C-alpha cells in the first residue's frame, strides 16, 4: 500500500541569491528523499517556496530605492531558477506573498487567538538606531547571559540552546550597522508556548527515530519555554486579521510565524492547482501519512517546538482544518514525523559571508560545473551530521577520484564496449558463480541503500552505492571481457550482460542522488520515458488576478521503480557519452583567485 509522504523543505529567504551552503542544508537532502520515495511508489508531496516578508527584505529595498515586493519578485525568480537547475523536484515551490498563503496564515492566527493561545503583552521592541525600523531577533547579536557565548542571537543561543529575547543579551548590537538597538515599549501578540509544554515534552520524548542533536536540542529548549512574540512593528508582512487592525499598517505578523505555515499553505495551493481542492488533506489529516521536515540546524526549534505547538492549538479547527461531513471531519492536522536537520557548511575554512565575499552562489557554481557533481559532493562530503568544509581542492578530488573514476568509469567502459561489439543487450550464456555473486550483491543494494535512504542517512547510502559500483569494476577487471572476446565470444557476451544488468540496477540506486546523469544513462541503455525529469514552471493566476510562478513536475509519468534491473536481451542501446567530466586541477587556483578578488 503506497504511503503518503510529505517532504517539507525549509523556505529560502528572498533577500538575495542562495549559496551552496544553503542548498546543502535544505535542498539536496530533501530532494534525494523525495525521489527515493517516488521510486518506491509512494505518494510524495514536496513543498516549499520563497520566504518573502520581514525587515531584511525592506532593508534591501531601501538600499536600492525600490519596494519590498520588487525585491521579493526578483529573488523568487533567481532562487526558483537555481533550484530548477539543481534538479530539486518540488510538487509546488511557491512564495509567501500569495493570497492563498495570507488566507491560511490569517486563519491559523485567528483560530489560535480565539482559543486563547495567542495573547497580548506589552514588551520592549528592538529598533535600529540608524533606520528606525524593527530589528528581527536574528539581526541582533550579543553575549549569552547564561553561557557567555559572544555570538548569541536575539532569539536563542546556538551554543547552549537557551531561548532568549533581545533584551536578555549582554551588550546587544545590530548586525545591520553594529550599533546597540533602541528598545521601545510596544504591544505585541504572543504565542503561548507554555500552554503546550507538557504535550510537547511527551511528544518529543517519544521520537526515538530523530537525530540525537535534534531531539536533545528540542528538549533543552523546553526547559525555559515562554510566550513568543508573533507580531512586529513593520509595514511589510501578513496583516493581523482582527477588526481593530483593518485600517492599520504599522504592525504585521512576524515572518517566522507565517513562514512555517507555508508548508500547509503550499500543500493547499498544490491541491487547488491540481484541480483537487481537498487533496491536501490526504497528507495533512491522514493519520497514516508521515511528515519529514528538512532544514539547517539553526531552524530546529521552529519545526520541533513552535510549529508543533501551532498545529496542536489549531487541531481540526478554523476555515481550513475543518472538514464538515467529510472524510477527515474532526481529525487534526498531523505533527512532524521526523525533523531532518543538517549542520553547517563552511567554505575554505571560513563561515559563508556574502558581504565579505566568502561565498559561491548556486547560479554561479552551475554556470561552470554540472549539477550532479555538486549534488554528489554535498551528499558524500556534506554537513549531514557535523559541520564540514567545502574546499575547491576537495571538490575536484571527489569529482575526479570518486565520481568519474568509479561510477563514471564503470558506465563508460561497459556501455562503450557493448555498443561497439554488440549494439544491443547481448544474449548471455550460462552464468558462473562469480557472475551470480556480483549480480546478487548489486541487487541487494536495492534493499541496503533503500534502508539507509528511508532513515535519511544519505551519506552512508551514497557511499554504499559507490562501493557496489567499485565491486562491479573489480569484477570486470578480473574477468577481462575485452580479452575474452577474442577467444570466447559467448563468455564475453555473458560478462558484458552481467555488467549491463548491474549498471541498470545501479542506475536506479543512483537516481535520487544524481538525477541528470541517471536520466542520460537510462536513455543510453535504450529505454524511453523519464526516471528523473523534467521539471517545469507553471504560471498560476489567483482569484484576485495576481499571477505567480510555481516550480513543479509531472512526476506521475516517471517510469522508474526502486527494483532490480529487468534489462531485456536484444534491447538496442543508444550511442553513449561519458556521464561526468574530469576536472583540470587548475580550476582550484582559478576559483581561489575568484574568491580572493571578491575579498578585495
Curated annotation (Swiss-Prot):
Q: Where are the transmembrane segments?
A: none
User: Could you tell me which InterPro entries the record lists for this protein?
Assistant: Anticodon_Met, Met-tRNA_ligase_1, Met-tRNA_synth, Methionyl/Leucyl_tRNA_Synth, MetRS_core, MetRS_Zn, Rossmann-like_a/b/a_fold, tRNAsynth_Ia_anticodon-bd
Among the GO molecular function terms of this UniProt record, one is:
metal ion binding
Cofactor list: Zn(2+)
Spell out the Gene3D superfamilies in the cross-references.
HUPs (3.40.50.620), Isoleucyl-tRNA Synthetase, Domain 1 (1.10.730.10), Methionyl-tRNA synthetase, Zn-domain (2.20.28.20)
E.C. numbers: 6.1.1.10
Q: List the GO biological process terms.
A: methionyl-tRNA aminoacylation
**Where can the motif 'HIGH' region be found?**
12-22
The protein's UniProt keywords, in alphabetical order, are: Aminoacyl-tRNA synthetase, ATP-binding, Cytoplasm, Ligase, Metal-binding, Nucleotide-binding, Protein biosynthesis, Zinc
Could you give the subunit structure recorded for this chain? Answer: Monomer.
Q: What's the family?
A: Belongs to the class-I aminoacyl-tRNA synthetase family. MetG type 1 subfamily.
What this protein is reported to do is described as: Is required not only for elongation of protein synthesis but also for the initiation of all mRNA translation through initiator tRNA(fMet) aminoacylation.
From the Swiss-Prot or TrEMBL record, give the protein name: Methionine--tRNA ligase
Which organism does this record belong to?
Answer: Chloroflexus aggregans (strain MD-66 / DSM 9485)
Q: Read off the lineage from the record.
A: Bacteria, Bacillati, Chloroflexota, Chloroflexia, Chloroflexales
Amino acid at each position: 500500500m503506497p504511503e503518503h509522504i510529505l517532504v517539507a523543505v525549509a523556505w529560502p529567504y528572498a533577500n538575495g541569491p542562495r549559496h551552496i551552503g544553503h542548498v546543502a542544508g535544505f535542498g539536496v537532502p530533501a530532494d534525494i528523499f523525495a525521489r527515493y520515495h517516488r521510486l518506491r511508489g509512494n505518494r510524495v508531496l514536496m513543498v516549499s517556496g520563497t520566504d518573502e516578508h520581514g525587515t531584511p527584505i525592506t532593508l534591501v529595498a531601501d538600499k536600492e530605492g525600490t519596494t519590498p515586493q520588487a525585491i521579493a519578485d526578483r529573488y523568487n525568480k533567481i532562487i526558483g531558477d537555481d533550484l530548477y537547475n539543481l534538479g530539486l523536484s518540488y510538487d509546488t515551490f511557491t512564495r509567501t506573498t500569495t493570497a492563498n498563503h495570507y488566507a491560511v496564515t490569517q486563519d491559523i492566527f485567528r483560530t489560535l487567538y480565539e482559543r486563547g493561545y495567542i495573547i497580548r503583552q506589552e514588551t520592549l521592541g528592538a529598533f535600529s538606531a540608524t533606520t528606525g525600523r524593527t530589528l528581527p531577533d536574528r539581526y541582533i547579536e550579543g553575549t549569552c547571559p547564561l553561557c557567555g557565548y559572544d555570538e548569541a542571537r536575539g532569539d536563542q543561543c546556538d551554543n547552549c540552546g537557551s531561548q532568549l529575547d533581545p533584551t536578555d543579551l549582554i551588550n546587544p548590537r545590530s548586525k545591520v550597522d553594529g550599533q546597540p538597538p533602541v528598545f521601545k515599549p510596544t504591544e505585541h501578540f504572543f504565542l503561548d508556548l507554555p500552554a503546550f509544554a507538557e504535550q510537547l515534552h511527551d511528544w518529543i520524548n517519544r521520537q526515538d527515530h530523530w537525530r540525537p542533536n535534534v531531539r536533545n536540542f528540542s528538549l533543552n529548549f523546553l526547559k525555559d519555554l515562554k510566550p513568543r512574540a508573533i507580531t512586529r512593528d513593520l509595514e511589510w508582512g501578513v496583516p493581523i486579521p482582527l477588526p481593530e487592525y483593518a485600517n492599520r499598517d504599522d504592525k504585521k505578523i512576524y515572518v517566522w510565524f507565517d513562514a512555517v505555515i507555508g508548508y500547509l499553505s503550499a500543500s493547499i495551493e498544490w491541491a487547488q492547482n491540481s484541480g483537487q481542492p481537498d487533496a491536501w488533506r490526504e497528507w495533512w489529516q491522514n493519520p497514516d501519512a508521515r511528515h519529514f521536515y528538512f532544514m539547517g540546524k539553526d531552524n530546529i526549534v521552529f519545526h520541533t517546538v513552535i510549529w508543533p505547538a501551532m498545529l496542536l492549538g489549531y487541531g481540526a479547527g478554523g476555515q481550513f482544518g475543518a472538514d464538515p461531513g467529510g472524510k477527515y471531519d474532526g481529525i487534526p492536522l498531523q505533527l512532524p514525523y521526523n525533523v531532518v536537520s543538517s549542520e553547517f557548511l563552511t567554505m575554505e575554512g571560513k563561515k559563508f559571508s556574502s558581504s565579505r565575499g566568502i561565498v559561491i552562489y548556486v547560479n554561479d557554481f552551475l554556470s561552470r560545473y554540472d549539477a550532479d557533481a555538486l549534488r554528489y559532493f554535498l551528499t558524500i562530503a556534506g554537513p549531514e551530521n557535523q559541520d564540514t568544509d567545502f574546499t575547491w581542492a576537495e571538490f575536484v578530488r571527489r569529482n575526479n577520484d570518486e565520481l568519474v573514476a568509479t561510477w563514471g568509469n564503470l558506465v563508460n567502459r561497459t556501455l562503450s564496449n557493448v555498443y561497439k561489439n554488440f549494439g544491443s543487450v547481448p544474449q548471455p550464456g550460462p552464468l558462473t558463480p562469480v557472475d551470480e555473486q556480483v549480480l546478487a550483491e548489486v541487487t541487494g543494494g536495492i534493499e541496503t541503500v533503500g534502508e539507509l535512504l528511508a532513515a535519511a542517512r544519505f551519506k552512508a547510502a551514497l557511499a554504499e552505492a559507490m562501493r557496489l559500483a567499485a565491486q562491479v569494476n573489480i569484477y570486470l577487471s578480473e574477468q577481462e571481457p575485452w580479452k575474452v572476446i577474442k577467444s570466447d565470444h559467448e563468455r564475453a557476451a555473458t560478462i558484458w550482460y552481467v555488467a549491463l544488468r548491474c549498471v541498470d540496477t545501479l542506475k536506479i540506486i543512483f537516481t535520487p542522488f544524481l538525477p541528470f546523469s541517471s536520466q542520460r544513462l537510462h536513455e543510453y541503455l535504450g529505454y524511453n520515458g523519464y526516471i528523473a525529469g523534467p521539471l517545469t514552471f507553471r504560471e498560476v493566476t489567483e482569484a484576485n488576478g495576481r499571477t505567480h510562478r510555481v516550480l513543479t513536475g509531472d512526476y506521475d509519468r516517471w517510469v522508474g521503480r526502486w527494483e532490480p534491473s529487468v534489462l531485456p536481451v536484444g534491447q538496442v542501446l543508444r550511442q553513449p557519452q561519458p556521464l561526468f567530466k574530469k576536472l583540470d586541477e587548475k580550476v582550484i587556483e582559478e576559483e581561489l583567485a575568484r574568491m580572493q578578488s571578491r575579498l578585495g
